[in-house]
Protein backbone atom coordinates (compact mmCIF):
# COMPACT_ATOMS: atom_id res chain seq x y z
CA UNK A 1 0.00 0.00 0.00
CA UNK A 2 1.17 3.49 -0.78
CA UNK A 3 2.18 5.30 2.37
CA UNK A 4 -0.08 8.05 3.67
CA UNK A 5 1.20 11.26 5.23
CA UNK A 6 -0.28 13.61 7.78
CA UNK A 7 -0.01 17.30 6.83
CA UNK A 8 3.19 18.88 8.12
CA UNK A 9 1.41 21.72 9.93
CA UNK A 10 -0.54 19.22 12.00
CA UNK A 11 2.62 17.36 12.98
CA UNK A 12 4.37 20.57 14.07
CA UNK A 13 1.31 21.77 15.98
CA UNK A 14 0.90 18.51 17.84
CA UNK A 15 4.53 17.97 18.79
CA UNK A 16 4.96 20.43 21.62
CA UNK A 17 2.00 19.44 23.80
CA UNK A 18 0.63 16.15 22.52
CA UNK A 19 -2.22 15.47 20.14
CA UNK A 20 -5.59 16.91 21.14
CA UNK A 21 -8.91 15.35 20.18
CA UNK A 22 -9.43 18.11 17.62
CA UNK A 23 -6.04 17.37 16.05
CA UNK A 24 -6.74 13.65 16.15
CA UNK A 25 -10.02 14.15 14.30
CA UNK A 26 -8.40 16.38 11.69
CA UNK A 27 -5.57 13.90 11.17
CA UNK A 28 -8.10 11.10 10.85
CA UNK A 29 -10.07 13.01 8.24
CA UNK A 30 -6.93 13.59 6.17
CA UNK A 31 -5.81 10.00 6.57
CA UNK A 32 -9.21 8.50 5.74
CA UNK A 33 -9.60 10.69 2.66
CA UNK A 34 -6.38 9.27 1.23
CA UNK A 35 -7.16 5.70 2.28
CA UNK A 36 -10.55 5.95 0.60
CA UNK A 37 -8.85 6.96 -2.63
CA UNK A 38 -6.22 4.23 -2.46
CA UNK A 39 -8.18 1.20 -1.27
CA UNK A 40 -10.93 -0.57 -3.24
CA UNK A 41 -13.96 -0.03 -1.01
CA UNK A 42 -17.19 -1.96 -1.36
CA UNK A 43 -19.69 0.55 -2.76
CA UNK A 44 -22.87 -1.48 -2.25
CA UNK A 45 -25.34 0.77 -0.39
CA UNK A 46 -26.97 -2.01 1.65
CA UNK A 47 -23.63 -3.43 2.75
CA UNK A 48 -22.40 -0.01 3.81
CA UNK A 49 -25.65 0.74 5.59
CA UNK A 50 -25.44 -2.44 7.66
CA UNK A 51 -21.77 -2.16 8.62
CA UNK A 52 -22.38 1.41 9.79
CA UNK A 53 -25.52 0.50 11.73
CA UNK A 54 -23.72 -2.30 13.55
CA UNK A 55 -20.60 -0.21 14.10
CA UNK A 56 -22.62 2.71 15.45
CA UNK A 57 -24.54 0.39 17.75
CA UNK A 58 -21.23 -0.50 19.40
CA UNK A 59 -19.38 2.82 19.18
CA UNK A 60 -22.31 4.77 20.61
CA UNK A 61 -21.89 2.86 23.89
CA UNK A 62 -18.25 3.86 24.32
CA UNK A 63 -16.65 6.79 26.09
CA UNK A 64 -15.98 8.35 22.66
CA UNK A 65 -19.49 8.22 21.29
CA UNK A 66 -19.11 11.87 20.27
CA UNK A 67 -16.75 11.00 17.40
CA UNK A 68 -18.18 10.91 13.89
CA UNK A 69 -17.67 7.19 13.46
CA UNK A 70 -17.42 5.77 9.92
CA UNK A 71 -17.19 2.10 8.97
CA UNK A 72 -16.02 0.66 5.65
CA UNK A 73 -15.70 -2.76 4.02
CA UNK A 74 -12.53 -2.96 1.94
CA UNK A 75 -12.94 -5.09 -1.19
CA UNK A 76 -9.85 -7.18 -0.44
CA UNK A 77 -9.62 -10.93 0.01
CA UNK A 78 -6.89 -10.85 2.64
CA UNK A 79 -7.97 -11.16 6.26
CA UNK A 80 -7.39 -7.90 8.10
CA UNK A 81 -8.93 -4.87 9.77
CA UNK A 82 -7.61 -1.55 11.05
CA UNK A 83 -8.78 1.76 12.46
CA UNK A 84 -7.71 5.34 11.86
CA UNK A 85 -7.66 7.98 14.62
CA UNK A 86 -10.85 9.97 14.85
CA UNK A 87 -13.23 7.06 14.36
CA UNK A 88 -12.63 5.47 10.94
CA UNK A 89 -12.79 1.66 10.94
CA UNK A 90 -11.95 -0.55 7.96
CA UNK A 91 -12.67 -4.29 7.72
CA UNK A 92 -11.49 -6.32 4.76
CA UNK A 93 -14.06 -8.35 2.90
CA UNK A 94 -11.93 -11.44 3.46
CA UNK A 95 -12.39 -11.08 7.21
CA UNK A 96 -16.11 -10.33 6.94
CA UNK A 97 -16.60 -13.47 4.84
CA UNK A 98 -15.12 -15.58 7.62
CA UNK A 99 -17.78 -14.49 10.10
CA UNK A 100 -20.82 -16.73 10.53
CA UNK A 101 -22.77 -14.75 13.09
CA UNK A 102 -23.39 -11.13 13.90
CA UNK A 103 -21.59 -11.34 17.24
CA UNK A 104 -18.38 -12.40 15.46
CA UNK A 105 -18.44 -9.36 13.19
CA UNK A 106 -19.33 -7.22 16.20
CA UNK A 107 -16.28 -8.58 18.01
CA UNK A 108 -14.03 -7.50 15.13
CA UNK A 109 -15.58 -4.03 15.04
CA UNK A 110 -15.48 -3.77 18.83
CA UNK A 111 -11.77 -4.54 18.83
CA UNK A 112 -10.93 -1.87 16.25
CA UNK A 113 -13.23 0.62 17.98
CA UNK A 114 -11.29 -0.15 21.15
CA UNK A 115 -8.02 0.95 19.56
CA UNK A 116 -9.60 4.32 18.74
CA UNK A 117 -11.26 4.69 22.14
CA UNK A 118 -7.93 4.07 23.87
CA UNK A 119 -6.04 6.25 21.35
CA UNK A 120 -3.44 3.55 20.72
CA UNK A 121 -2.39 4.92 17.33
CA UNK A 122 -2.32 8.49 18.65
CA UNK A 123 -0.05 7.42 21.50
CA UNK A 124 2.30 5.75 19.01
CA UNK A 125 2.37 8.92 16.97
CA UNK A 126 3.16 11.04 20.03
CA UNK A 127 6.11 8.79 20.86
CA UNK A 128 7.40 8.90 17.30
CA UNK A 129 7.13 12.64 16.81
CA UNK A 130 10.05 13.59 19.01
CA UNK A 131 12.45 11.33 17.13
CA UNK A 132 11.14 12.08 13.66
CA UNK A 133 10.34 15.78 13.68
CA UNK A 134 13.85 16.80 12.61
CA UNK A 135 13.83 14.51 9.60
CA UNK A 136 10.30 15.65 8.77
CA UNK A 137 11.43 19.27 8.75
CA UNK A 138 14.39 18.45 6.51
CA UNK A 139 12.11 16.61 4.12
CA UNK A 140 9.68 19.48 3.81
CA UNK A 141 12.33 22.17 3.47
CA UNK A 142 14.55 20.33 0.99
CA UNK A 143 11.80 18.64 -1.03
CA UNK A 144 13.41 15.19 -0.83
CA UNK A 145 10.35 13.38 0.45
CA UNK A 146 11.02 10.34 -1.70
CA UNK A 147 14.46 9.70 -0.26
CA UNK A 148 15.13 6.81 2.08
CA UNK A 149 15.96 9.23 4.89
CA UNK A 150 12.69 11.08 4.46
CA UNK A 151 10.69 7.88 4.29
CA UNK A 152 12.25 6.81 7.57
CA UNK A 153 11.24 10.01 9.29
CA UNK A 154 8.19 11.64 7.82
CA UNK A 155 5.89 8.67 7.65
CA UNK A 156 4.42 9.11 11.09
CA UNK A 157 0.85 8.53 9.97
CA UNK A 158 1.35 5.49 7.79
CA UNK A 159 3.69 3.80 10.24
CA UNK A 160 1.37 4.40 13.17
CA UNK A 161 -1.79 3.30 11.42
CA UNK A 162 -0.35 0.10 10.00
CA UNK A 163 2.06 -0.64 12.84
CA UNK A 164 2.01 -3.86 14.77
CA UNK A 165 0.38 -3.05 18.07
CA UNK A 166 1.95 -4.36 21.25
CA UNK A 167 0.47 -7.34 23.03
CA UNK A 168 -0.66 -4.94 25.73
CA UNK A 169 -2.51 -2.80 23.19
CA UNK A 170 -4.17 -5.87 21.70
CA UNK A 171 -5.24 -7.13 25.12
CA UNK A 172 -6.73 -3.74 25.94
CA UNK A 173 -8.60 -3.64 22.62
CA UNK A 174 -9.92 -7.16 23.23
CA UNK A 175 -11.17 -6.09 26.67
CA UNK A 176 -12.84 -3.10 25.03
CA UNK A 177 -14.46 -5.41 22.48
CA UNK A 178 -16.00 -7.47 25.28
CA UNK A 179 -17.10 -4.41 27.24
CA UNK A 180 -18.60 -2.56 24.31
CA UNK A 181 -20.40 -5.49 22.73
CA UNK A 182 -22.05 -6.28 26.06
CA UNK A 183 -23.07 -2.62 26.41
CA UNK A 184 -24.57 -2.81 22.91
CA UNK A 185 -26.62 -5.88 23.82
CA UNK A 186 -24.45 -8.26 21.79
CA UNK A 187 -23.03 -11.57 23.00
CA UNK A 188 -19.28 -11.06 23.62
CA UNK A 189 -18.43 -14.69 22.89
CA UNK A 190 -18.11 -13.72 19.22
CA UNK A 191 -14.78 -12.13 20.16
CA UNK A 192 -13.52 -15.58 21.12
CA UNK A 193 -15.08 -17.70 18.37
CA UNK A 194 -13.76 -15.35 15.68
CA UNK A 195 -10.26 -15.57 17.03
CA UNK A 196 -10.50 -19.36 17.33
CA UNK A 197 -11.41 -19.53 13.63
CA UNK A 198 -8.44 -17.43 12.60
CA UNK A 199 -6.02 -19.44 14.73
CA UNK A 200 -7.36 -22.68 13.24
CA UNK A 201 -6.97 -21.27 9.73
CA UNK A 202 -3.46 -20.12 10.53
CA UNK A 203 -2.53 -23.73 11.24
CA UNK A 204 -4.06 -25.08 8.02
CA UNK A 205 -3.60 -22.12 5.63
CA UNK A 206 -1.08 -19.72 7.19
CA UNK A 207 -0.75 -17.48 4.13
CA UNK A 208 -4.47 -16.71 4.19
CA UNK A 209 -4.32 -14.96 7.56
CA UNK A 210 -0.70 -13.80 7.71
CA UNK A 211 -1.63 -10.12 7.27
CA UNK A 212 -4.00 -10.26 10.23
CA UNK A 213 -1.48 -11.82 12.61
CA UNK A 214 1.26 -9.48 11.39
CA UNK A 215 -0.73 -6.54 12.78
CA UNK A 216 -2.57 -8.34 15.61
CA UNK A 217 0.03 -10.21 17.70
CA UNK A 218 -0.86 -12.89 20.20
CA UNK A 219 -2.67 -16.17 19.87
CA UNK A 220 -4.25 -18.51 22.42
CA UNK A 221 -3.28 -16.22 25.31
CA UNK A 222 -5.67 -13.61 23.94
CA UNK A 223 -8.53 -16.10 23.99
CA UNK A 224 -7.82 -16.86 27.64
CA UNK A 225 -7.68 -13.15 28.47
CA UNK A 226 -10.91 -12.39 26.58
CA UNK A 227 -12.67 -15.24 28.37
CA UNK A 228 -11.49 -13.80 31.68
CA UNK A 229 -13.08 -10.49 30.71
CA UNK A 230 -16.34 -12.25 29.86
CA UNK A 231 -16.25 -14.12 33.17
CA UNK A 232 -16.42 -10.79 35.00
CA UNK A 233 -20.09 -10.62 34.00
CA UNK A 234 -22.70 -12.76 35.75
CA UNK A 235 -23.82 -15.53 33.42
CA UNK A 236 -27.42 -14.41 33.87
CA UNK A 237 -26.59 -10.97 32.44
CA UNK A 238 -25.24 -12.51 29.22
CA UNK A 239 -27.96 -15.08 28.67
CA UNK A 240 -30.27 -12.93 26.56
CA UNK A 241 -27.68 -11.01 24.55
CA UNK A 242 -27.92 -11.19 20.76
CA UNK A 243 -25.73 -13.59 18.80
CA UNK A 244 -27.27 -13.28 15.36
CA UNK A 245 -29.94 -11.43 13.37
CA UNK A 246 -31.71 -11.82 10.05
CA UNK A 247 -30.23 -8.47 8.99
CA UNK A 248 -26.74 -9.91 9.49
CA UNK A 249 -27.65 -12.99 7.46
CA UNK A 250 -28.82 -10.78 4.60
CA UNK A 251 -25.65 -8.70 4.86
CA UNK A 252 -23.43 -11.78 4.75
CA UNK A 253 -25.30 -13.23 1.78
CA UNK A 254 -24.93 -9.93 -0.06
CA UNK A 255 -21.19 -9.80 0.69
CA UNK A 256 -20.71 -13.34 -0.58
CA UNK A 257 -22.66 -12.62 -3.77
CA UNK A 258 -20.25 -9.88 -4.87
CA UNK A 259 -17.82 -10.49 -7.74
CA UNK A 260 -14.34 -11.63 -6.63
CA UNK A 261 -12.21 -8.99 -4.97
CA UNK A 262 -9.68 -7.28 -7.25
CA UNK A 263 -6.06 -8.47 -7.00
CA UNK A 264 -3.83 -6.49 -4.65
CA UNK A 265 -2.23 -3.41 -6.18
CA UNK A 266 1.48 -3.50 -6.92
CA UNK A 267 3.49 -1.93 -4.13
Label the predicted regions.
Residues 2-6, 17-267:
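A Zn2+-metalloprotease active-site environment signal
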Amino acid sequence: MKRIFIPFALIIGATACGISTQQEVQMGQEEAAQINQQLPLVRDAEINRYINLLGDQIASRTSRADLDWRFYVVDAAEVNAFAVPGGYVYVNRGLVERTDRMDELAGVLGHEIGHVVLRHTVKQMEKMQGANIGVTLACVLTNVCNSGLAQAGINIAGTAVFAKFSRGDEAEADAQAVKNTVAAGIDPHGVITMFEKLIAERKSRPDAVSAFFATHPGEEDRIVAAQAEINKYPASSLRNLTTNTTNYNSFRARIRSLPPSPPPRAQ
